[in-house]
Amino acid sequence: MDELENALAIPREEVLLVSAKEGTGVPELLEAIVERIPPPKGDPDKPLRALVFDSHYDQYKGVVVYVRLDEGTLRDDDRIRLMQSGAEAELIELGVFRPALVPVPLLAAGEVGYVATGLKNVREAQVGDTITIATDPAAAPLSSRAAGGFI
């Protein structure tokens, strides 16, 4: 315990003893997460700005991008635009990680998920690009600092 306190500068009373393998301390850990970690910020009513933090190509869904929504809401029937590349796409699928990919009808500000775009070239969805709604675009793309240093 002294080593953790000294190496990480964490007060002894804030250290939680947890073993997922044995199931000890897990309820306390979950409660501490709720109490200590602030909820995501962002206005779900503003124009969509979602930061692309990873992407890959799927032979059935096209380019799949992993995103964190900074502002706005993304629905599974939206047409999106990647602000840097200018590429537009109708969504094939929208979802979250649980830990498998699970389709959902919408994502809102503060959430992390994936977007199957149907695009054929992964270069059209680069890490650091910003996704917005094609018919109601945001005024400016995100920067990594604006997104909490996410990339």
Describe the predicted segments one by one:
Residues 5-151:
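Conserved catalytic-core segments of large NTP-driven translation/proteostasis enzymes
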